[in-house]
């Protein structure tokens, strides 16, 4: 079976992530899969690590040169009309709009539904060796007003080079958790330097997000709407996703679920990997989170049902801060700095 490269993955250079060799403390590429246990609501996580492959280059300079050559090749392909994807077309998705109305959430609705075996959109069982973040459970929220329902059209799935490489990963058992303890000051400094080097290696830059406790939701807002200012709307939508589909997420929250929802409603409450999964499920998009972990270069989060081929890309300074990331030269222009448009008479 042939695979067409995912245009977004090429644009981001994500098809090269497997060769990241910034640390010798383990593999630099990891994805985690949440699988259903026997009870329907409980689950466990399997995390995969890339094994060393003989013949891959070790030298960071060589890797960086390879990446630059790849970018040049993609640019030539785009110039010749092979790839018609433009930054405008990437942004032009039919996401829920921040101005749309939303019903009062109220108490979380308890929907009882047994988990099914994971299938892809063609109905085929997925490769168990591909470790991906995905919670089991119900399919969608109860019927609500049309304005509050995601209207992103489901597109034909296109597996990227990253997806093909992830098939070679060997999963290991792992326990899901929400935010952990903050690292020490020294660890924070070294983690930040490691994250910076990884972003620099792959030609990615951070859109610096305000550190007010809303950084995850601001980063998601920036990726979805090209502005971090719609973070309250994104938080509201994510909390609704968690509330209306509690059977999917409750097993991964080590506290009373209603207390967790009340906390997540509050402005300034830190998001975690449960809210990231809920956001991926809500918008139906894949997420790539470049991390500062020693043994994990990136995490891929897959939605329960993919509705778009678009990628959401974040950086995660582990347990400290999220930023929105872009390829060099593609940072969105802040609202106040956009060029004025004049009518020509």
Swiss-Prot record:
Entries under PANTHER family matching the protein: OTU DOMAIN CONTAINING PROTEIN (PTHR12419), OVARIAN TUMOR DOMAIN-CONTAINING DEUBIQUITINATING ENZYME 9 (PTHR12419:SF111)
PROSITE patterns in the record: OTU
Record-linked SUPFAM superfamilies: Cysteine proteinases
Active-site residues, record numbering mapped to chain: 212, 215 (nucleophile), 321
Pfam name, any one: OTU
Every OTU domain range: 204-328
Assigned keywords, A-Z: Hydrolase, Ubl conjugation pathway
UniProt-listed Enzyme Commission number(s): 3.4.19.12
GO function terms (MF aspect): cysteine-type deubiquitinase activity
Enzyme class, spelled out: hydrolase
Catalytic activity reported: Thiol-dependent hydrolysis of ester, thioester, amide, peptide and isopeptide bonds formed by the C-terminal Gly of ubiquitin (a 76-residue protein attached to proteins as an intracellular targeting signal)
pH effect summary: Optimum pH is 7.
Family: Belongs to the peptidase C85 family.
Record flagged with keyword Signal: no
Descriptive protein name: OVARIAN TUMOR DOMAIN-containing deubiquitinating enzyme 9
Organism: Arabidopsis thaliana (Mouse-ear cress)
Domain of life, per lineage: Eukaryota
């Amino acid at each position: 079976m042939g695979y067409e490269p995912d245009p977004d993955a090429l644009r981001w250079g994500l098809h090269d992530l497997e060769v990241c060799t910034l640390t010798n403390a383990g593999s630099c590429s990891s994805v985690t899969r949440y699988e259903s246990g026997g009870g329907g609501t409980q689950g466990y996580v399997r995390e995969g690590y890339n094994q060393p492959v003989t013949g891959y280059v070790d030298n960071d300079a060589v890797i960086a040169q390879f990446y630059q050559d790849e970018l040049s090749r993609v640019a030539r392909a785009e110039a010749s009309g092979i790839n018609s994807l433009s930054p405008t077309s990437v942004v032009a998705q039919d996401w829920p709009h921040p101005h749309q109305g939303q019903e009062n959430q109220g108490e979380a609705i308890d929907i009882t539904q047994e988990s099914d075996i994971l299938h892809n959109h063609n109905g085929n069982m997925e490769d168990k060796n591909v470790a991906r973040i995905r919670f089991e459970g119900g399919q969608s929220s109860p019927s609500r007003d049309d304005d509050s329902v995601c209207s992103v059209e489901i597109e034909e799935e296109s597996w990227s080079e990253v997806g093909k490489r992830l098939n070679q990963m060997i999963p290991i058992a792992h326990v899901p958790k929400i935010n952990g303890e903050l690292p020490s000051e020294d660890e924070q400094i070294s983690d930040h330097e490691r994250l910076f080097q990884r972003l620099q290696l792959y030609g990615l830059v951070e859109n610096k997000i305000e550190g007010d406790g809303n950084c995850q939701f601001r980063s998601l807002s920036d990726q979805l709407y090209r502005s971090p200012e719609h973070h309250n709307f994104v938080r509201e939508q994510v909390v609704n996703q968690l509330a209306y589909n509690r059977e999917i997420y409750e097993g991964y929250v080590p506290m009373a679920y209603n207390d967790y929802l009340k906390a997540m409603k509050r402005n300034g409450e830190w998001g975690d990997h449960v809210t990231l999964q809920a956001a991926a499920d809500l918008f139906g998009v894949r997420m790539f989170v470049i991390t500062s972990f020693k043994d994990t270069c990136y995490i891929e989060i897959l939605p329960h049902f993919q509705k778009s081929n678009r990628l959401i890309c974040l950086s995660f300074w582990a347990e400290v801060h999220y930023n929105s990331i872009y390829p060099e030269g593609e940072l969105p222009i802040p609202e106040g700095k956009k060029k004025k448009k004049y009518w020509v008479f």
